[in-house]
């Protein structure tokens, strides 16, 4: 005979792996060309001066310099710039 009553089987207990999104290099930080600045879904941040956009909307530095976050344009969107030295 069983020593314990049978435990129920739950159908929960799964979760997706975190995608490590977010800002990777903050304002006034020095970066090299190719450094990832922001990983994002969609475009909360837009590519500014010396910044490129990847297929998955990742922003990366096209030149070495200092990172700047600037709000501009008619909708006051946030742009990420890399200001060269």
From Swiss-Prot:
InterPro entries, per database record: Ribosomal_bL27, Ribosomal_bL27_CS
Pfam families reported for this sequence: Ribosomal_L27
Transmembrane segment boundaries: none
Region entry Disordered, spans: 1-23
Keywords, sorted A to Z: Ribonucleoprotein, Ribosomal protein
Key word Ribosomal protein present: yes
UniProt cross-references to SUPFAM superfamilies, sorted A to Z: Ribosomal L27 protein-like
Keyword DNA repair in annotation: no
Record GO biological process: translation
GO molecular function, one term: structural constituent of ribosome
Gene Ontology terms: cellular component: cytosolic large ribosomal subunit
The family this protein is said to belong to: Belongs to the bacterial ribosomal protein bL27 family.
Name of the molecule in the record: Large ribosomal subunit protein bL27
Annotated source species: Nitrosococcus oceani (strain ATCC 19707 / BCRC 17464 / JCM 30415 / NCIMB 11848 / C-107)
Gene encoding the protein: rpmA
């Amino acid at each position: 005979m069983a020593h314990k009553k049978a435990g129920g089987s739950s159908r929960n207990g799964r979760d997706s792996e975190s995608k490590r999104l977010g800002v990777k290099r903050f304002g006034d930080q020095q970066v090299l060309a190719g450094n990832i600045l922001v990983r994002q879904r969609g475009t909360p941040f837009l590519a500014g001066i010396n910044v490129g956009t990847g297929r998955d909307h990742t922003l990366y530095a096209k030149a070495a310099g200092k990172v700047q976050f600037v709000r501009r344009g008619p909708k006051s969107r946030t742009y990420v710039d890399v200001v060269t030295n």
